[in-house]
Curated annotation (Swiss-Prot):
Reported function: Promotes mitochondrial protein synthesis. May act as a fidelity factor of the translation reaction, by catalyzing a one-codon backward translocation of tRNAs on improperly translocated ribosomes. Binds to mitochondrial ribosomes in a GTP-dependent manner.
GO biological process assignments: mitochondrial translational elongation; positive regulation of translation
Species whose genome carries this gene: Schizosaccharomyces pombe (strain 972 / ATCC 24843)
Domain annotation tr-type G: ranges: 56-237
Record-given protein name: Translation factor guf1, mitochondrial
């Protein structure tokens, strides 16, 4: 009995103590939560923080590197480090907003993000621009660097300096930007930090006594980058009290808000309700909203000199947003800023809807994509075989491929794309010159022509030295002209060739990767037009030219290509009621021929016997009918045949 009372007493006391502890803990929790909420209420908003940062604590900088050297991964680390993104909203390649970018693992569009960084007790506004690494998107890099005072040059410690590393360095150097080299992927077993440091110092003449060695994958030493940016990259120039001058560096279209512009404020300020005008065109707009990318569109009260942000300005016509244009306050007499040179298209294709009824809608979709990528050249054209379509110009084959993917991802549309061609120049004896980007306009009769010229590129190839001989053979087979060959180290060399652009379009990069087991890198820039022996290769069906299959080739390749195309096309063309003749024609001369037999119909099936002349009469009647049909009829070819043929040819 006593044991029972003791246990009851102990249990009661324990419960009372526990209840008292719980009451006290709950009171403490409520009190702590109240203080925490109060502190959060007192915490200034991002708009207030940005408004309080003076111009001398603003830094505009970009990340440039060769493709796949870790630019986007490094940007992710820096955004997490500064608190712009956290574990809840984080995803890999955070700034890569396009589906094609995340699927392919490459950056296509330069993306901007602002961040707040506290250094030595002061807040800094850091505007980061993540740039593409592929040569086809060089224009994006150029536009991005125009908005910066400095950049991070990222180099893969396992691969060293690559072709696009050189190109991006000289692009930044030509704009007098502060360049901070950073070695990435130092945690890899294949990383050779010492060798890469020597390469950077010797190639770029940059002292590497205190190198920044990071791993964007693990986050190692990434925190060392931001203090370097603050200390070495100067703040932007320009007075907030001066008349407004802002540079349009990018634009995109929103169905509800119209054209949205990304601008760098060079002088003055801009705010909601302001009236601005284009210095070049004189068109006027009312500003509906201004803000920064943090990381998404975040409205602020005003954008001041030195800042990078977006403007919603009631612009409905997508043709009015000209990248590189200068905007100022209405009534201000200011000088236009140096704009951007429009990049010249290097690859042209014919594009046609698979369904003719989609033409108008596709036209709107293509114009909206062209607004977001001014390097795309769009012209309408008509094909007798494929109907209404467009002649599209791109900076390269990857640029073309990304455009096709974006059209499918963002609008659910597909196009029938003809063979890529390059712009050729024709000089006539009377002094006139003409540039031809459509093969159907290339003359078959060379009378009156003094010279035919094709575009070339200056290609820079960096390859392991053991593949040097194979690379030279590949370039020579593409009619290349060697310009230089230097050894960067005992194991790597850099070779420069002048190559016909037409060969570069025809999967030269893929062949280069196959020749060097994927170790070679390629960069190129536009070079001169040189004389070439060019001919037009036409495909005829039953005596009529098929304009969708026309191309311009060098005479040395024309015969082989004509035979290949005819043999590949033959099994795809459906049989007709009469024989169909396929011909490859060069300079009005047939160089390859195939025939597709007619559909057979047994017209004598009902004749079971009797005079043989009855059967002969029916056969002759059928023969005359086929002859008459052949003389007046057209070969009916569905678009799916062209789609299959062109798709196979491009994949090969």
């Amino acid at each position: 009995m006593s044991i029972f009372r003791l246990s009851r007493t102990f249990s009661l006391e324990t419960c009372l103590k526990s209840s008292s502890f719980k009451i006290r803990w709950r009171f403490f929790s409520v009190s702590y939560a109240s203080r925490k909420l109060a502190s959060e209420d007192n915490k200034p908003s991002i708009q207030e923080v940005v408004r309080g940062i003076p111009q001398n604590r603003v830094r505009n900088w970009a990340v440039i590197a060769h493709i796949d050297h870790g630019k986007s991964t490094l940007s992710d680390c820096i955004l997490k480090l500064t608190g712009v993104i956290n574990e809840h909203n984080f995803r890999n390649q955070f700034l890569d907003k396009l589906e094609v970018e995340r699927r392919r693992g490459i950056t296509v569009k330069a993306q901007t993000c602002s961040m707040i960084y506290y250094y030595h007790g002061q807040s800094y506004l850091l505007n980061l621009i993540d740039t593409p690494g592929h040569v086809d998107f060089r224009a994006e890099v150029m536009h991005s660097l125009a908005a910066c005072e400095g950049c991070i040059l990222l180099v893969d410690a396992s691969q060293g300096i690559q072709a696009q590393t050189l190109s991006n360095f000289y692009m930044a150097f030509s704009q007098n930007l502060v360049i901070i080299p950073v070695l990435n992927k130092v945690d890899l077993p294949t990383a050779d930090v010492d060798r890469t440091l020597i390469q950077v110092q010797q190639t770029f003449d940059i002292p590497m006594s205190k190198p920044i060695l990071v791993s964007s994958k693990t986050g190692k030493n990434v925190e060392q980058i931001l203090p370097e940016i603050i200390q070495k990259i100067p703040p932007p120039k320009g007075s907030e009290n001066a008349p407004l001058r802002c540079l349009l560096i990018d634009s995109w279209y929103n169905s509800y808000q119209g054209v949205i512009g990304l601008v760098r404020i060079m002088e003055g300020f801009i705010k909601k309700g302001g009236k601005v005008m284009s210095v070049n065109t004189g068109r006027k707009y009312e500003v509906q909203q201004v803000g920064i990318m943090y990381p998404d569109m975040t409205e602020v009260s005003r954008l001041r000199a030195g800042q990078v942000g977006y403007i919603i300005w009631n612009m409905k016509n997508i043709d009015e947003a000209i990248v590189g244009d200068t905007y100022s306050t209405i009534g201000s007499n200011v000088e236009a800023l140096p704009g951007f040179s429009i990049p010249q298209s290097m690859v042209y294709v014919g594009a046609f809807p698979l369904d003719g009824s989609d033409y108008e809608r596709l036209n709107d979709n293509i114009e909206q994509l062209a607004l977001n990528d001014r390097a795309i050249n769009v012209q309408k054209e008509n094909s007798s075989a494929l109907g209404m379509g467009w002649r599209l110009g791109f900076l390269g084959t990857l640029h073309l491929s990304v455009f096709i993917d974006r059209l499918k991802d963002e609008y659910g549309k597909e196009l029938l794309i003809t063979s890529p061609t390059v712009p050729y120049r024709i000089k006539y004896k009377n002094g006139r010159e003409e540039v031809i980007s459509n093969p159907n306009l290339f003359p078959t009769n060379h009378q009156g022509i003094s010279e035919l010229l094709e575009p070339t590129v200056d290609a820079t190839i960096i390859t392991p030295s053991e593949y040097l001989g194979d690379v030279i053979k590949l370039c020579e087979s593409c009619r290349g002209l060697q310009k230089d060959c230097t050894y960067m180290s005992e194991s790597r060399c850099m070779i420069k060739y002048q190559l016909p652009l037409a060969h570069l379009v025809e999967d030269f990069f893929g062949r280069l990767k196959g020749t060097t087991s994927g170790f070679a890198t390629l960069d190129y820039e536009e070079s001169d037009y040189v004389p070439a022996d060019l001919v037009r290769l036409s495909i005829f069906m039953s005596g009529k030219s098929v304009d969708a299959l026309c191309s311009i080739v060098h005479r040395s390749l024309a015969l082989q290509r004509g035979r290949e195309w005819i043999q590949r096309l033959k099994p795809l063309v459906p049989k007709q009621l009469y024989e169909v003749i396929l011909q490859a024609v060069i300079d009005n001369r047939v160089v390859a021929r195939e025939s597709i037999s007619a559909l057979r119909k047994n017209v004598t099936a009902k004749c079971y016997g009797g005079d043989v002349t009855r059967k002969q009469k029916l056969l002759n009647k059928q023969k005359e009918g086929k002859k008459r049909l052949k003389s007046v009829g057209n070969v009916s070819i569905d678009k799916s045949v062209f789609y299959e043929f062109l798709t196979k040819k491009q994949s090969n």
